[in-house]
Amino acid sequence: MSERVVTLDVESIDEIVAELEREFSAQDVPTLLRLRASMLTEEVFSAVREVATDTAKLRCTFPSPRTMVLQYRDKDGALKPDLSMAARLAKNPCTDGVSVAFHEGSCTVTIDRSGS
């Protein structure tokens, strides 16, 4: 089974979900809705977009049902991690149960909420 990949140019969580639902097959929609409810808080999404401001292009991959990887590039096309953003998110109570890590131009968001 190949990895799911989509590039997004969106302004809000509603848009990201709508774009993903258009890109992926119908059988993936329940997983995407779980991602929306459990993981894509405004705080997480806003912080990722802040990092990707120059292009607003996010490449999303879903290596597992509990993990989403967002890759982004700056205006020169270079990978651009922002560790201070990850630290801010880690301390945000709204992201409890969600870990966010920025590395090598990617933002990995992992859900750690069993049974939710």
Residue ranges and their predicted role:
Residues S2-P30:
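Helix-loop-beta hinge of the Bergerat
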Residues R22-M39, G77:
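A short, compositionally biased N-terminal segment around positions ~18-40 that is enriched
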Residues M1-E3, A47-S116:
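Conserved beta-strand-loop-beta-strand hairpin that lines the nucleotide-binding pocket
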Residues I13-V17, R34-T41, D82-S84:
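Generic alpha-helical secondary structure
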Residues T31-K57:
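Conserved ATP-binding N-box helix of the HATPase_c
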Residues V17, P30, L35-R36, C107, ...:
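Residue-level signal for functionally critical sites in structured catalytic/ligand-binding pockets
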Residues L8-V10, E21-E23, R34, L89, ...:
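Short acidic/polar alpha-helix capping motifs at helix-coil junctions
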